[in-house]
Amino acid sequence: MRAMGCEVQDARCGMSYRDLGIWKLARETAIAVHRMTLENLPKFEMYEEGSQIRRSAKSISANIVEGYGRRRYKQEFIRFLVFAHASCDETIEHLEMLFETGSLTNELVYGDLSAQLDLLGRKLNVFIDSVERSHRTGRSDISERASRIAHLAS
């Protein structure tokens, strides 16, 4: 969590969304889901549930990126992180549906993806809480600190 404040701040830290651990995990998960649909699903699912789960998995990292791009505005950042979390939940639902209907029969693949999505959802919750508590935008925080210091000095 050392860099969390820096992650949430802005360009002063020289960071990109690519530096966010949560984005990296979301991206890895989307790639794993994509591969699962190509390697483990029957052909008839490729354009049905397979398409749905690919889109919802890719939406997680895409919403993190879009939120990060709007990080100057705390509520916008949080809004897109909440969208990312909702997409994570949607992806879990699609995965469970594929497994329970017998379209995904590989229990190891199901278990690994399920655990990865569960971890991602928990980490998204922690990240959202962190942004809510420690959001920094740069200039406004400097002005606020300067006002507090001026008030204490008088």
Where is each model-derived feature located?
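Amphipathic alpha-helical assembly/interaction segments
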Residues: M1-S154
